[in-house]
Amino acid sequence: MIKFSNISKEYHVGTQFVKALNQVNFEIEPHQLTVILGPSGSGKSTLLNILGGMGRPTKGDISFNDQQVNKLNDHDLTSYRRKVVGFVFQFYNLIPSLTALENVAIAAQLNNNDDLSENYLKSVGLEERMNNFPNQLSGGEMQRVSIARALAKKPKLLLCDEPTGALDSTTSMKILGILQNIANTTDTAVVMVTHNPEFERYGNRIIRLKDGEIESINDNEQPLLVGETG
């Protein structure tokens, strides 16, 4: 379980302090898709950076299974990112000279699971595209490769920053379905930052941010599954 306790984050801009997050509290459970919504500038990306160990809060505590992440030294924080967290971004960051399989294999080898690379691509529906290079793939296919690459780390926490932001609505729903399936069938907690309010129907927990503060937290007892109508 991930727990945010009174998290605040300030940035020094010129002679002033800008508060990106203010007294934020929430919990993230495994087997859940958590959707974080909010307008631009609401603090979504800052929150995701702190969750992923890429930034430290100014105040407050973040814990993972009772381990105080914000109190880790730099070496241990790097280990936390490598062993616990997988990242999926809006832009795919694939290595253009490598095939889909090779892009995933790099991450798998770093985590001693290189023999499972094909399985990760199969899990996102790319068994027929493993030997294609990124320039031979559509945007949605490249995003699926990036998800498979993140899964190759066997993360306990999968952080997705606007993963459908560059995709059309049909492809976006396919990506959402993959993320929902990961949350439902593995021990991984999936957190997705998005500006798309339509996605809140599909999350187990919906966190709304506004001006760096929690506006609301709502749980869906029966979230809509991708492919269903409601």
Regions found by a protein language model. Name each.
Residues 2-208:
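ABC family nucleotide-binding domain
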Residues 205, 213-230:
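Conserved beta-strand-loop-alpha-helix hinge in the C-terminal portion
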